[in-house]
Each structure stands twice: as structure tokens, then as C-alpha cells.
Amino acid sequence: MSRSVSNAGTRLAGFGHRWLPFADAASADLSLGRLLRLSMFQLSTGMAIVLLTGTLNRVMVVELGQPASWVSLMLAIPLLMAPARALIGYRSDHHRSYLGWRRIPFLWSGTMMQFGGLAFMPFALILMTEPHSGPAFLGPTAAMASFLLTGLGMHVAQTAGLALATDLATEDTRPRVVALLYLMLLIGMIGSALIFAALLEDFGYVRLIQVIQSAA
């Protein structure tokens, strides 16, 4: 009886490695379930990319009437932070932690930066579009700060997450692990694009703020 159960388990494992996508990316120290949980940060990164470059890019120019030069500058700010990935990776490589977690503090910090930038963004949009008694540059400056915080959080979380995945993967499975992580990034971008399109089909100013707050 035990032999038949063992044979059934072996056949089931072989079926998984044969038919499940990226099942061969798993290893003894990094199971497929653990790898999928680790790759969740790529979904949020893909969502933030679509929200910044796909949704707010058009909405701020067409619907909110903001100058295209301001919007293009805001979108360029996260890209200008890309060279900081080298410093982030170096710091996470040499980070000393009493718990032995080198990457987790950076991954957590990047996620919190994304949350802070997206949570602050609705207030920045209100300052840009609604009349207020403050200086005129207050709204664009607040929007740039939220874009900067979100973009920096994306770079920090993605750099630390990819480094953590490559640390846990074996040398043989490392290429497939990285491929799975970038597949999750594409899934996050495609899924969030469809969701944002459905939610903003009947566009409204309040609806836009609700969508951004939900994304945060």
C-alpha cells in the first residue's frame, strides 16, 4: 500500500514538472509555492508602472488639463532613479542584520515607499486641479514628490526582491527563477491595465482618486 502511494506521488510530481509552467524552477530550498509568494512583489511593481505611465500619463494631460511638459517630467523622475539600483544592490549585499535578513529590510522599505507615494498622490492631484490659497507650484511639486517616492520604491523593492530570489535559487534554476519573476511582472502589468480600464471607463475625478487609493 505504501509503495503504491509513493509511486502515485512520484507520478504526480512528474506530472507537475512536465505540465506546470516553471515547475522546474523550484529547488529543495525554494519550493514552487514559496517562489510564487516571493514573486508577488512583481505584481505590485507592474501595477505601479501601469498606473504611472499608462493611466496617469493620459489622465493628467487630457482629463485634468495639466501641461504635458510637467507630466513628462514627472514620468521621467522614476526613470532617473534607475542608476540607484547599483547602490541599492550593493547596500543589500553588505547589510548586517541581527536576524540574518539582508534583503528583507530593503524589500519592505521599497514596498512602503510605493505605498507612501500612491497614498499621497490623490492629495497632490487635488492640489494641482482644485483652487487653493497656496503657491501655484505647490501642486506640481507635491505630484513630483509622490512620483519620486513611488518610483524609488519600485526600484528598491524590485532590486532587493530579485537579489533575494537569486540568493535562494540554485545555479541551475536561477535563469528560470528570474524568468518567472519577470513573467509575474508582465502579468501584473496586463492585469492592472485591464482593471484600470474597466474602473475608469466611466471617468470621474472622484473615481480616479478612489482607484489610486485602492492601488495603494
Predicted regions mapped to residue ranges:
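Membrane-embedded alpha-helical bundles of multi-pass transporters/translocases
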Residues: 2-216
